[in-house]
Amino acid sequence: MDHNVFSQFAYKHPGRINVARDVIAFDMMLDHSCLDIWGILQTPDWYPRFFRGLGSCEQVSGNAQEFEVRVSTPRGAVVVHEMRQTLRESSMLMWFHATQVSHCFVSIRLTPEEGGTRIAVRIFGVGLLHPDLAKTGDGAVRNWVREGLLRISDYLEGKQSSLLVNMGDGHSLLLSVAKTMLVSGVVRASRPDRGLRQLNSLAKWGFTLAGGLGAAAARSPHNIASVDRYGTSTYADVAERTACIASGLAAGGFTSDSTFAVLARNHAAMVECMVAASKLGADLVLLNTGLAARAIEEIIKHNAVDAIFVDDDLDPQVRYLPAEVPRISTHPNSILPQRGSIDDLISAGPGAPPVAPPRQPGKLIVLTSGTTGTPKGARRPTPPGFGAVAAMLSRMPLRRDEVMLLCAPLFHAWGLAALQVSTPLVATVVLMERFDAEECLKTVALQRCTVLILVPVMLQRILELPADVVGRYDTSSLRVVASSGSPISGASVIKFMDTFGDILYNFYGSTEVSWATVADPTDLRLAPTTAGRPPLGTRIAILGQDGNPLPVGAVGRIFVGNDMLFDGYTNAASPAVEDQLMDTGDLGYLDASGRLFIAGRDDEMIISGGENVFPRPVEEAIAALPQVADVAVVGVPDPEFGQRLAAFVVRAPAASLDEEMIKDYVRNRLSRFSIPRDVTFVDQLPRTATGKVLKRRLTDGQFPLETGWPG
């Protein structure tokens, strides 16, 4: 036992040491220098990268030698540890203890020896340091610490270990897919007749929107397929209407070689346009409703669009289109003069020959967010089978006959993915045209929704509602709330689950790679900022500049492999692909438990005074302040340091907050080079229609410093 350490602790904390308690003591050697190992051990927020089962580790107060660290646990509890560091000529010593309880203490001493470093670990009262350690024996605790220290060694050595593959139960991916389909109710062994009709439709139309809708209609024709402000439609209704729309389009001279576009909000008619184009085998461009008229003109021209479906109130955004591009109204009775509608196509459909299944499925073209410039058109692939559905269901427990409130825009990859998974589940999709936080909760209560699909900015708007407003609505029917599209702050994750229960799922992916990882409630309770783990049939790798995997814990480029990698852009070169893994353009790392964390976009990394700084940890730190409603951190030019950090902050209503308070708060939690030099208070941040912050707008010189962005 290290008696000097024991004596120091006993002197400072009299009465806390019970010598009769068990003590875990062991030494081990690592083939690395004391300074290299010490550099990691003195950085508490890195501990989850190497030690399994740890959530966030955040410094909350103190200085470089003595400070407090807050550690989250799987049950959401927080343990605060006091840490102290001592540097001597012959060794380096670190010790810490839980401040809320007595009789617990850990010391780690590093001593240089020939060929490496001897690490002496002494643990007193292990079960009081972390609640999960109380359930294990001394041998398991000793192995846990050893494994963590060995991962630090692997990190320093550069071991190529940042590669994750989810192949299910390990025996067969196909068997895992089949099991997932049975558990979710997509396939039922008890009704082979309905299953046969379902498979016949998929054989006819493929795993497309047309095939999914047709399979659901063949299996459960009288189930409600959609609900919007105009009414309800059964699966049989939608199948019949979309067949007529497709026939009407064919009668008008459109073919599988045609390309359509749709500019619409979430409603049943938009879904019908999408399914009808799928039945015809035509390509369909999903237009963001937030695009300017000139941008839409450019996209229509580039994609050689033959006709466009458009909501009447969005007509000003298509005013620059050539007259030879027909506009088809999505509204039953268009108020616009000489404007045909999808109801006109439905009326013409019964007299036209039915549309035969196309030889090749049409492509859905989804636009990227355009946060770094002009949106790119991404060709979405046709799912090769049930694997795409099984991937989502393997990490999110959706079941047959769900009632799904779809708030995420259908023109966005996330909204589209939710629609695609709804038909195998024969779910009822409730469509919200314009998002309003209170109206969302009201709809959940009225429709008894079991699933809510949204993007993070919508989740944030719900959290901003007063408690008495939230309390008016019974949301107990919700089992799953799924968010995707941009990061959610850790503070918002915890607040949402504390308010609505542990039902939050956070999807990470992109238009190009579809899904990559999913964080379930267990992940989020332990590590609120995690992007989660890969779903079934998915590979994740963190690669370095040489294209090889990096060690666990190291930040590198995130590459993803699955069955739904996109088929390329319509107007740009495709991202890099390494060994069937596609570059997401994001940087991140894997922790010891196999969870992914996003550091930021490759082009967001800030180099200040030679130090690499990512905005996300700084944003997370500032967002934890209750006086902060929203925040974005960017890099701006600096004549001395090359770049410096600038924070744009939205105050919470009636909050008192100034620049120095924010700097002091960050100073106590992150390294000195993570402190923003500039803090600007604004009314709101510029965002895309799906909620992503337009950071380039913050640095292009047109930002109004005093009044923020107009609402």
Where are the regions a protein language model picked out?
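Conserved pre-ATP/AMP-binding loop-to-beta segment of ANL
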Residues: 334, 343-367, 374, 396-403
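Conserved AMP-binding A3 loop
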Residues: 234-236, 363-387
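Conserved ATP/PPi-binding loop(s) of AMP-dependent carboxylate-activating enzymes
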Residues: 534-537, 545-579, 611-613
